[in-house]
Amino acid sequence: MEFGNLYLTSKLKTIADADLKSNMLNHAYLLFGQDEIYLNYLAKQFAKHVLCKNNICGVCPTCKKIEKGVHADVLCYPKTDDKNIVVEDVNEIVEKAYVYPMEESKKIFILNNFDLATVQAQNKLLKTLEEPPKTSMFVLTSTNPSNILNTIKSRTKQVSVPLLEDKQIETFILNNSTLKLREVAPFVASSQGNLTKAKKIVDDPDFVKIKQLCLQIVLELNKSGDILKYSSKILSFKGRVTEVFDELSLVLLDCLYCKLNLLERVSNNQNINEFLSSNFSVKSLKLVYEELLNSQDKLKNNCNVNVVVDNFLITMLEVKHKWK
């Protein structure tokens, strides 16, 4: 994947610059946020930042080896994307941590998705983080830091990684897909600053269908007979109702912003005229949006999907007509 200069403008680079300048580089960092792809990318760039002697040049042997994943002193775990870190991995990490680096002054261990590591594996790593070798450094990433032992977190420098700007997401999508600039706006809006989500929806053949369905629901749900029609269409995306509701929330917000004349906040401006002419009132849109949030909570709590979808559409229609 092509990431451009995302690291150079990141919060992590600012922190790393300060730590390196003051010679206060920590032995362990925990990078946490919502975006798995971005976190894993940052961890690798951070390793380049620490080891490259030419300010993250990207072309020296150190940078090239780290990028290809073949640097002897930059070791990534888990070794494959379909695995989580287990005790056997940590045994190997601990053993290698006490071996002097082969090419650099420091050995860096990147532990991606550490919140998915087993409790046994986390406990096994704890002693090494408590008494770290002077020549080893650890970079952990996590999208759910609450699943990491507090004793582990307390021995790391924690860096909260924010989501990206829409322009950065747009550039990422254009660099990593066949989409044209005129086509990219709906994908950027639905990515919500998240590279992981951006990649998923760009690669998803059903994304455009889901987006179109959500537009139809907001603009064309007008009579009771439409409830069964749209309920069936939503449920046809088996196991993906939560994603449909996520998209629906974005469409509802866009419609609301149009009605409030806050056009600068509309994420996808291709449907502004339809939203402005829709028979939704501001009050009804706010109530429907609140009901959608409640429905999303019900899905998270494993309520019956069919019932949640039907009840939401019924409420949406009732509110739409009551508060014209």
Q: Which functions belong to the PLM regions below?
A:
Residues 1-49, 62-65, 134-135, 144-251, ...:
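Charged, glycine-rich active-site and insertion segments that engage polyanionic ligands
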Residues 1-120:
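Clamp-loader machinery-focused feature within the broader ASCE/P-loop NTPase space
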Residues 31, 111, 125-126, 142:
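Hydrophobic residues in beta-strands of the RecA-like P-loop NTPase core, especially within AAA+ ATPase
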Residues 76, 140, 158-160:
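Structural signal for conserved beta-strand scaffold positions within catalytic alpha/beta enzyme cores
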Residues 95, 127, 150, 154:
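Conserved adenine-binding aromatic site and its adjacent loop/helix in ATP-hydrolyzing domains
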Residues 98, 123-140:
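Conserved catalytic/switch belt of AAA+ P-loop NTPases
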Residues 112-118, 126, 130, 146:
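Catalytic acidic motif of RecA-like/P-loop NTPases
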